[in-house]
């Protein structure tokens, strides 16, 4: 093999996952490798179309390397030579159940979370609860902000506040000129917190209660309000991976 071909060939990293020998390109995460091998790992904040954030921790797995074993988020952990991965042990199931219980404490009415909880054997309501004024269906996964910035290119929404007051909102908590009304944020929301509804002949984007006049959409060049969004924003953007991640 010539030096040029050798340099161009991707480096394959051998490792073990659930007792199986495997090898993937350098830089592949444990989650990506597992999905390619048909191993199911639940996720909420992960989407192939955008950068990894590692917010929900539902995809936790057990990794052993260098004589050390620990739990870690599979979406952010790159495979390495000699790595041993386990995706379904009692400790992992216990950790995932705790994650879902904590998410349900903040978002007790989120149907997708309830479905994941049922699959993991978690009873609802759980052991924990936020104060009613701090409860809503947003789990702070950041998918809406990431897709708005990285795919749409608008960067119209972002995180604000800290701690239990953290929220994803438009800048200055009001509709911004940066928003083009494509509703891609609605498409990727894993808990259906973001919705678009027609109120008194005005389209309002919940949960931000924002409305806007008609403007030209930079995606299709058509004139539309924030309410008249594209039925399939993922298809319009030319990507097919904006499905909601609900196991």
Range-by-range predicted roles:
Residues 68-181, 192-247:
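Fe-S ferredoxin-like electron-transfer domains
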């Amino acid at each position: 093999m010539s030096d040029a071909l050798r340099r161009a060939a991707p480096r394959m990293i051998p490792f073990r996952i659930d007792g199986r020998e495997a090898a993937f390109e350098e830089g592949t995460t444990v989650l990506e490798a597992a999905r390619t091998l048909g191993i199911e790992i639940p996720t909420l904040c992960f989407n192939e179309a955008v950068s990894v954030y590692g917010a929900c921790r539902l995809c936790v797995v057990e990794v052993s390397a260098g004589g050390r074993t620990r739990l870690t988020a599979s979406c952010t952990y790159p495979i390495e030579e000699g790595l041993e991965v386990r995706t379904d042990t009692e400790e992992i199931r216990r950790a995932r159940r705790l994650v879902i219980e904590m998410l349900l404490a903040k978002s007790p009415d989120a149907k997708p979370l309830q479905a994941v909880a049922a699959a993991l054997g978690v009873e609802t309501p759980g052991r924990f609860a936020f104060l009613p004024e701090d409860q809503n269906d947003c789990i702070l996964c950041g998918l809406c902000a990431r897709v708005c910035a990285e795919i749409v290119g608008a960067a119209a929404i972002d995180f604000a506040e800290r701690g239990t007051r953290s929220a994803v909102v438009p800048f200055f908590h009001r509709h911004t000129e940066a928003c083009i009304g494509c509703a891609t944020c609605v498409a990727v929301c894993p808990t259906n917190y973001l919705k678009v509804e027609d109120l008194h002949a005005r389209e309002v984007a919940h949960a931000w209660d924002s409305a806007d006049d008609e403007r030209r959409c930079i995606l299709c060049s058509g004139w539309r309000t924030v309410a008249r969004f594209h039925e399939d924003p993922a298809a319009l953007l030319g990507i097919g991976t904006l499905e909601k991640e609900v196991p």
